[in-house]
Amino acid sequence: MMTINNNNLNNSNNINNNNNIYTSNNNNNNNNYLIQTVPTMSETFDHMIETPQNDYISIHNHNQHNNHSPHQFYNNQYQHYQYTNDLIKLQPFCEINGQNDFQNSYQDPYQHQLSPPDMVGPYVNSYSNNSNNTNLIQNNNNQQLPSIITSPTIPLPPSPPSPTIINNSNNTISTIQFVNNKKRQHSDTTSSSSIYFIQQPHSTSTPFSLQCPNSPNSTSSSPLNSINYSYHPTFRVVTSSSSSASSSSTSSQPPSPQTLLSSSSISISNSSSFYNNTEASDEEMEEQFKEYLSPTISNLIESSHRENILNLVNDYLYEELPLKSLLMELREIQYQLGNGQNQSLLNNLIELFLILDNSSNVMINFLKENGVEDSEITIDQKRLSIILNDFENGLRGKDKTIKKSTSRGLRNPPNKWTKEESSKLITLVHENGDKQWKKIALQIGGGKTGAQCAQHWKRVLCPAIRKGSWDEEEEAKLFLLVEKHGQSWKNVASEIRTRTDIQCRYQYFKSCMSREVPWTPKEDEILQKKVIENKQDSTKEIGWMDLSKAMARARQTKIPRTALECKIRFYFLNAQL
């Protein structure tokens, strides 16, 4: 008999006879174990044990295949039975699928352990570790019950990988190895049929981390021979230690841009002779970038701004959104998320720009021209030194040939459209229409797909799409359509007809951000002056779009005022006179 028992039976007397129990209705010997998640507090068994969507271990044979999700598999294999005295006295058990074994489901951190059961109620359980022995279970009336044998064919669940196996990175900064629910991680200490399904990373401060205490009864290191097996019910990936990075970022004062640029250890071209006249391959650098950005990306994926960030990056790669607008949007997202312990995506991008550029003065000027402030350019000197060392160590560890180059510079976006390709696309659309995109993509070549051709035509080259600033009528129509359709930008763009969904989304958020900034007396003065100058020419109406551009050139606010906003503000001021 294989019994999953608990070392602490103090709460066994609190179990009511009316509790429910799960038992198997499938007699197939497919060796599937389900490790349920049970609250660690001492409660009665009145609440049904719930199996989470992703937290389970499946141990099965190679000749059988299971495509169900954990929740579907659990519901298909288990059905509810009333807890009766005829089955088990005093203890809640679950019958394991396909075997005459019972699983103790006590509500305890060490609930998933293999240990000999104590004598319970009127039943005296004779237990033996030897799987070849047949044991009889007798009750007080000396009634002989069917014998239950410890099955030699069922392998014990493998011990969970330690945090050093999950996070085997030698970097000192905080890194995360992403293992989604579809990837499988095999344990080297068990048979090849053992499979872990690992959830997304959690903070080490949560009670679900791997840093749980070991069982005091655990004596054997081999998971196949150990009787006591401690397995936490919700196994998750945790982040590696980042004490050195966090301590350096909090203990040192960020220097000024001049101090940052004057340090020889900051520039990637001067930090080591490894970078003086050589460069790593794109694949190696990309791998290091992913490792560096992974903590920030993992936090953004779980935030409510995930879709907005993905759309912004996509627009920038397709050259539909300038870098200045991208940085402005990222700054606004940073304000909405708050100043937490993790760095924002904007800070990470600024650091990467400084690392990749060999002429930092040029990069500083470039960032300032695109709206980056001095306070955002200053970063921690010790942290940047750690980043450079990690990049260098990570690239040195690759057994690949280092390519020589005079300078690296920033990478161009993938599949960037040239003028010749854009002209050819216009010609092919006039010849074939705007439906046969696969055919057009084959004729253009250059690795372009049909979707890329369609997006480039609809968002960039289509003559019906207007470019540049919005006038007051377009913006007023935009707000009405957003009130009608919500943030379904495709529906909004289909009714506007002269703007793409990307333009509609960008203009809407830009207008909302501008309206949150109060008008200053200086702005009101400039607005009144420009309107008076425009009215002197009575042959034409007031051009609010041109007036908003003049307001933007005055640089009284960081966010330019829109044409509709200028019009509303002017009539509001004159109504008060």
UniProtKB/Swiss-Prot annotation:
Keyword Repeat: yes
Record keywords, A-Z: DNA-binding, Nucleus, Repeat, Transcription, Transcription regulation
Chief place where the protein resides: nucleus
Domain Myb-like: 518-570
Localization per Swiss-Prot or TrEMBL: Nucleus
N-terminal signal peptide: none
Residue ranges annotated for the HTH myb-type domain, each copy included: 403-465, 466-517
Recorded GO CC terms: nucleus
Regions of compositional bias (Low complexity) in chain numbering: 213-225
Pfam name, any one: Myb_DNA-bind_6
Molecular function as annotated in GO: DNA-binding transcription factor activity, RNA polymerase II-specific; RNA polymerase II cis-regulatory region sequence-specific DNA binding
InterPro entries per record: Homeodomain-like_sf, Myb-like_DNA-bd, Myb_dom, SANT/Myb
Source superkingdom: Eukaryota
GO BP annotation list: cell motility; regulation of DNA-templated transcription
Stretch list, region Disordered: 1-23, 206-225, 240-264
SMART domains xrefs: SANT
UniProt DNA-binding region: 437-461, 489-513
Protein name in the entry: Myb-like protein N
Organismal lineage: Eukaryota, Amoebozoa, Evosea, Eumycetozoa, Dictyostelia
